[in-house]
Design a protein with these regions (language model features):
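Catalytic cores of the polymerase beta-like nucleotidyltransferase superfamily
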Residues: 1-392
Length: 392
């Protein structure tokens, strides 16, 4: 039902909506793009060099290239290659294949708190979901057994459930979300490979979706959240979201109801814990999306102007900016303390003993607001510890 409703709203089937557009390869030299090679992490360059010496293609990719073009030093460096995960793993002493939905390799440099992880992904094919034979019912949570042995699978709504079909670089670029995140940089030749005018958009400071935005949101509804997150993150640098990219966001929002709760919870934390929580809330309001993405996020947005909550959000942004760790338990405990306090006061008015009354109020709020998410046990314990300290 949701798929049909969204299709009607977005006009699925319009001419050209399903065409493959792999873009035209442009190799842009250093004299044009102006990237300062001193901003490139040596460990990322070493990973690229090792892969190339083994006969593979390899590039720094994604947001790191965007930041380099803007003259910024990236916090994280990802590498893309035509080597398979198994081939990548065989080239490095400390490399680990992770993920099932998207199989990637973590190449680890250093140890302890000083260690650095370079994420290496294999070029992936761009597959038109209308041509996929491996269509399954259910969603990411209910179709794990059905996905066994599949390299690429989608559900009836067109959402990608598994994406491990390797392909050429041009298709890998097309399957990425935004033009400014779909460029490839070779630190040895200092050439940027650009298929979708990403350099041009970076100079214009424009966040633009690759392909038809409505179709891309249908393929993976979490792209809706990423559009908000990146537009908020890049707003501080003067970026604006392209109207065609922003246009279908509200109409596509209902697609998020099919995404498993644990994944939605994780995506919400990314919105709030990547150093741009206040900017994200402002962007949600600007886009008319302050409600309806995720119930707990609705509460955060609603209470963001309360001094206690605003201070917690601002402190989280500050700590991320300073490279310090942040904990979801602290931020969520601040946001939901109002509910716990109300429930506790109600129980005290009924002459319940203070400590058991507080514990009951905590249980009620956690079950209602957080629900069944991955990592629930530790999160609950940490939030409980914070809340129990408040009456002291």
């Amino acid at each position: 039902m949701i798929k049909k409703f969204i299709d009607k709203l977005l006009g699925k089937g319009a001419a050209g909506a399903g065409k493959h557009r792999f873009g035209k390869r442009e190799e842009v030299p250093a004299s044009v793009h102006g990237i300062n090679p001193d901003l490139v992490d040596r460990r990322a360059s070493d990973v690229v060099r090792t892969l190339k010496q083994a006969g593979y293609e390899a590039y720094i990719v994604g947001g790191a290239v965007r930041d380099l073009l803007l003259g910024l030093k990236p916090k994280d460096f990802d590498v893309a290659t035509n080597a398979t995960p198994e081939q990548v793993k065989g080239l490095f002493r400390r490399a680990f294949i992770i993920g099932k939905r998207f199989r990637i390799v973590h190449v680890v440099h250093g140890r302890g708190r000083e260690h650095e992880v370079i994420e290496v992904s294999t070029f992936r094919a761009y597959l038109d979901n209308t041509a996929i034979e491996q269509q399954v019912s259910g969603n990411e949570k209910t179709s794990k057994q059905q996905l066994s042995g599949m390299q690429h699978a989608v559900d009836a709504s067109g959402r990608v459930l598994r994406d491990n079909v390797w392909g050429p670089q041009d298709e890998d670029a097309t399957r990425r979300d935004f033009t400014v995140n779909a460029m490839y940089y070779d630190p040895e030749t200092q050439v940027v490979v650009d298929y979708h005018k990403g350099i041009q958009d970076a100079k214009k400071k424009l966040l633009r979706m690759i392909g038809d935005p409505a179709t891309r949101y249908r393929e993976d509804p979490v792209r809706i959240i990423r559009a908000v997150r990146f537009s908020a993150k890049l707003a501080a640098l003067g970026f604006t979201i392209e109207p065609k990219t922003a246009g279908p966001l509200i109409a596509s929002q209902a697609l998020l109801s099919d995404v498993p709760q644990s994944r939605m919870f994780d995506e919400m934390l990314k919105l709030l814990q990547t150093g741009h929580a206040l900017a994200t809330i402002a962007q949600l309001k600007k886009l008319g999306m302050s409600k309806g993405i995720y119930p707990l996020l609705d509460v955060v947005v609603e209470r963001a102007e309360l001094p206690f909550v605003h201070a917690a959000l601002a402190d989280t942004d500050r700590r991320v900016g300073e490279g310090k760790p942040v904990a979801p338990s602290f931020l969520l405990a601040c946001v939901l303390w109002q509910d716990v306090k109300t429930g506790w006061d109600l129980r005290l008015a009924q002459r319940q003993h203070p400590f058991p009354a507080l514990q009951d109020a905590i249980d009620e709020v956690f079950n209602q607001r957080i629900g069944d998410v991955s990592g629930r046990g530790k999160l609950a314990a940490d939030m409980r510890e914070i809340w129990v300290m408040q009456p002291r």
